Regions:
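Iron-sulfur-cluster electron-transfer modules
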Residues: 1-185
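Ferredoxin-type iron-sulfur electron-transfer modules in oxidoreductases and energy-metabolism complexes
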Residues: 41-57, 85-87, 93, 103-107, ...
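Short acidic, glycine/serine/threonine-rich loops at helix termini
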Residues: 66, 71-74, 100-103, 141-146, ...
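Short amphipathic, charge-patterned alpha-helical segments
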Residues: 115-121, 256-272
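Short, surface-exposed connector motifs at secondary-structure boundaries
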Residues: 124-130, 246-249, 336-337
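Short acidic beta-strand-loop surface patches of small beta-rich interaction domains
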Residues: 137, 245-246, 270-296
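Hydrophobic alpha-helical positions that pack around
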Residues: 139-257, 268-272
Length: 434
């Protein structure tokens, strides 16, 4: 089994039944400037404080993985502006997570929605400069064309630049984005300081995910109460979920937070009886067994079971062996780490080697014990969260699939006997759509 990497496969794009899309635009042609204006885009902002209050009440959480409240970020950078500091906005569209496609899709198909979100964020924090940070060539071209269409005056005098970078897992980390814009390497920096303290050119900087910013125009146009009409109390609004695996073409869905996981399966055409588990949050949040069938898609539910929604990427495991999937993901972390923190460089290599040996039936009980120990002691020891992601994958494999681990120790995994899952970039998906 060569794996289920799905690069180049046609992407299904749809909203959940009964959901009026806020982020997706169907059919999925590239939205023009005139079409966006006709829908009320680039509306004048009368009162900054009023919109800030609405963002606070909306409870809009970051869609990049950490689910940090956008209102808190905005107010922190705005406070620096009010103290007389120059401020900057960065729209982070470097979607380094191979199993996620949402940000690239928005940048390619709805660049004006993203730019409108950047415009509003800049007004809220008092910024005159902003950057759209991307690694996808098609996304960069779409944004560049949109900037030519929209004009300087519509943006309120905001100077927006596009910064491109080679794709990479760590390149999307917020301090890596700032380093690239400042002329440095696409590698995370030690924290503190964080970008809101000392970012682009040393100025307080709001770094926010593309999908997060794309929600701002909806809040501005319709208010917090309407935004909260979808989702849960703690996880309000809709969000974009990239679904891969299960032997089916990849898909990008817009769903409300709180929807049952089984509803997502039905939308994707997968029977719960087929499901062995899921790889959650792209590669970061680790593996879940069939307990995932009892979940709802919101941050509070997944935190309670030791997992996470992360960037909203869900890989459904049906025929793939979770041990082999974990080994592939850990090998990816080993290749993709920045190579600048010894604990991460050595830790990801050690975990990848142990998981690879387990997949191949060559591991010992001592290897598994070491993998278990590393998944605990290595957390929080890198400049970014790459090592934490690797630890999550290792820990969740051992916790959720102990019987499979034992089968691999005994060299008798029936799934791997038919061919080992060995994708270099497991569940990778492109933003293409026919």
């Amino acid at each position: 089994m060569s794996g289920t990497a799905q690069a180049g496969t046609v992407l299904t794009v749809a909203a959940a039944p009964g959901v009026t899309p806020r982020l997706l635009r169907l059919p999925a042609a590239v939205e023009t400037h005139s079409a966006y204006l006709a829908d009320g885009g680039y509306a004048l902002l009368d009162n900054v404080e009023t919109l800030l209050a609405e963002v606070d009440r909306s409870g809009l959480l970051g869609r990049g993985g950490a689910a940090f409240p956008l209102g808190v970020k905005l107010r922190t950078v705005r406070a620096a502006h009010l103290r007389g500091h120059e401020t900057v906005v960065v729209a982070n569209g470097e979607e380094g997570e191979p199993a996620s496609v949402k940000d690239r899709w928005l940048l390619r198909h709805r660049p004006h929605l993203v730019l409108d979100g950047v415009r509003l964020a800049a007004r809220l924090v008092g910024a005159q400069r902003a950057y759209v940070y991307v690694s996808d060539r098609a996304a960069a071209l779409a944004v560049d064309h949109a900037l030519d269409e929209v004009g300087f005056d519509t943006l309120g005098g905001l100077d927006i630049s596009i910064v491109t970078v080679d794709p990479g897992y760590v390149a999307g980390e917020e301090t890596a984005a700032v380093r690239v814009i400042n002329g440095g390497p696409a590698k995370p920096a030690d924290k503190p300081p964080r970008p809101f303290q000392h970012g682009v050119a040393g100025h307080p900087t709001l770094v926010s995910n593309v999908e997060t910013l794309a929600n701002l125009p909806h809040v501005a146009a319709h208010g917090a109460a309407e935004f909260r009409s979808a989702g849960t109390e703690a996880s309000p609004g809709t969000f974009l979920v990239t679904v891969t695996g299960a032997g089916r073409p990849p898909a990008l869905y817009e769903v409300p937070h709180g929807v049952p996981f089984t509803d997502l399966l039905a939308l994707h055409g997968v029977s719960p009886d087929q499901v062995r588990g899921a790889l959650m949050g792209g590669y970061f949040a680790g593996l879940l067994d069939r307990a995932v069938l009892d979940t709802t898609l919101d941050h509070e539910t997944f935190r309670a079971i030791g997992s996470g929604l992360g960037c909203g990427a869900v890989a459904i495991l049906t025929d793939d062996c979770p041990v082999a999937v974990a080994a592939s993901v850990l090998a990816y972390f080993d290749r993709e780490n920045a190579g600048q923190c010894g604990s991460c460089f050595n830790g990801t290599a050690a975990m990848a080697a142990a998981a690879g040996a387990l997949r191949d039936g060559a591991a010992t009980a001592e290897d598994v014990a070491r993998l278990d120990r590393w998944s605990v002691v290595l957390r929080g020891r890198g400049a970014c969260a790459t090592l934490d992601g690797a630890a999550n994958v290792a820990a969740s494999l051992l916790k959720r699939f102990p019987q499979l681990v034992e089968q691999h120790l005994a060299g008798r995994c029936e799934t791997c006997r038919d061919g080992t899952f060995s994708a270099q970039r497991p569940y990778e998906v492109e933003a293409s759509r026919s």
